């Protein structure tokens, strides 16, 4: 199976081009004002025009108001929503759009395999479950986590697609793919020169490392 890849936190046209040319399956825009990678709907709409057919656009939110999500839907027309805060199943499903639900593995209540699996099951209609590491703030932490916490999710026959995040970069992504065998990866800071400024070289290195593992697994 080929591991899908989303490059998140894009803010520049040239970085979208780098991600697409390297073979990314999806790109992500962050609509969380506290993030250094935040873009507003108008800017995201401009960037979205650089995304070709068959590359998905994902809109990331953290505890948004409904009108904030609607503005993104109207301006950007994302293919997928991603909720990275404390959103309930009702919050995530109210827009009638496909969505990813992110879980911060290691957070209180999510610090055991059983606890994490139980939380995930509340979002059975999600298109995928994304797993990031826990930190005091919201959004991506840029740090890894104990992948053993995913054991309950991996053993669940009703599991949704597993999307792995958390400190992934060209130097560790191959080991992460071998250990977890996720459906997809979500990478941001691990392919950056600075927050919101992606490195074309790091993106290429990341994609090459993933491809090398996928080829062996066939």
Swiss-Prot record:
Gene3D superfamilies: Aldolase class I
InterPro entries reported in the protein's UniProt record: Aldolase_TIM, PRAI_dom, RibuloseP-bd_barrel, TrpF_fam
Biological processes per GO annotation: L-tryptophan biosynthetic process
Catalytic reaction list: N-(5-phospho-beta-D-ribosyl)anthranilate = 1-(2-carboxyphenylamino)-1-deoxy-D-ribulose 5-phosphate
Annotated metabolic or biological route of this protein: Amino-acid biosynthesis; L-tryptophan biosynthesis; L-tryptophan from chorismate: step 3/5
Keyword Signal assigned: no
Enzyme class: isomerase
E.C. number: 5.3.1.24
Keywords assigned: Amino-acid biosynthesis, Aromatic amino acid biosynthesis, Isomerase, Tryptophan biosynthesis
Gene Ontology molecular-function annotations: phosphoribosylanthranilate isomerase activity
Family: Belongs to the TrpF family.
NCBIfam families named in the record: PRK01222.1-4
Protein name: N-(5'-phosphoribosyl)anthranilate isomerase
Organism of origin: Bordetella bronchiseptica (strain ATCC BAA-588 / NCTC 13252 / RB50)
């Amino acid at each position: 199976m080929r591991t899908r890849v989303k490059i998140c936190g894009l803010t520049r046209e040239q970085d979208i081009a780098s991600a697409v040319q390297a073979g990314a399956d999806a790109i992500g825009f962050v609509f969380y004002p506290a993030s250094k990678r935040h873009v507003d709907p108008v800017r995201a709409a401009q960037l979205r025009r650089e995304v070709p057919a068959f590359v998905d656009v994902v809109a990331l939110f953290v505890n948004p108001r409904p009108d904030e999500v609607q503005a993104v839907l109207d301006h950007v027309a994302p293919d997928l929503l991603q909720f990275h805060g404390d959103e309930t199943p009702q919050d995530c499903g109210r827009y009638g759009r496909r969505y990813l639900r992110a879980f911060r593995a290691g957070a209180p209540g999510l610090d055991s395999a059983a606890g994490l699996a139980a939380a995930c099951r509340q979002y059975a209609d999600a298109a995928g479950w994304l797993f990031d590491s826990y930190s005091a703030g919201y959004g991506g932490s840029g740090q890894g986590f104990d992948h053993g916490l995913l054991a309950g999710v991996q053993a669940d026959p009703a599991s949704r697609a597993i999307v792995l995040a958390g400190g992934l970069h060209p130097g560790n992504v191959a080991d992460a793919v071998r250990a977890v065998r996720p459906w997809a990866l979500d990478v941001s800071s691990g392919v950056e020169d600075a927050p919101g400024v992606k490195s074309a070289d790091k993106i290429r290195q990341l994609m090459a490392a993933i491809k090398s593992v996928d080829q062996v697994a066939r």
